[in-house]
Amino acid sequence: MNISLKRVAFPALICSAFLLSACGNKNTEHSDEVTPEDKVMQELSSEAIRNFDKTPNDQHDILLLVDYDNRYTQVSDEMEDELIKLSKSGDLTAEFSYTRKKDNLVSASEMLKNLDLKTEQGRYIQGLIAGYWDQQLKLLEQHKDKTLNDKSLSEDKLKGLGGYLHAQDQLENW
């Protein structure tokens, strides 16, 4: 009985080794390929939080940036709700969608630039967010003729989002 077990076990072990090595080679061959999920994760990866010296104006800038974020979020949510409602009713045109989104981005950018930030950290966060809005405006210009439901527009919205998320993390850490 021992001899037959050895005869079966040894070939099974060899076959298993070959199968595992073949699977391992296949994985290493494809590891250079960047999957869509990898692209999303790369875009969303955020820089490390930068440390800034504390200043007497920190609270002032924090309040301004939080207020800005709350006001922008409210206006943006209302605009998105309006576009979704129009899309569902079949009344949404690419031109109207483009105009509303552009107005929203320009307004967000102008509101941000008009903040009277007094600290280096506040201006750093302001710059990160402004860079994101500039990127979104460029993308919007490239996709003028697309509506809310267009898949390529949704994928492009992720571009530059890492900087925006870093700004949010930086503000939250502050």
What is the predicted role of each segment?
Residues N2-A12:
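Bacterial N-terminal signal peptides that target proteins for export
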Residues L19-A22:
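C-terminal motif of bacterial Sec signal peptides marking the signal peptidase cleavage site
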Residues N25-F96, Q170-W174:
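Immediate post-signal-peptide N-terminus of mature secreted/exported proteins
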Residues S97-K157:
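Long, amphipathic, charge-rich alpha-helical segments that form helical bundles/coiled-coils
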Residues G160-W174:
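Short, low-complexity, Pro/Ser/Thr/Gly-rich segments in the mature regions of secreted, periplasmic
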Residues V40, D61-L64, Y68, V75, ...:
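Stable alpha-helical elements in mature extracytoplasmic
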Residues S45-S46, S76-L83, K101-L112, L140, ...:
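Extended amphipathic alpha-helical scaffold segments
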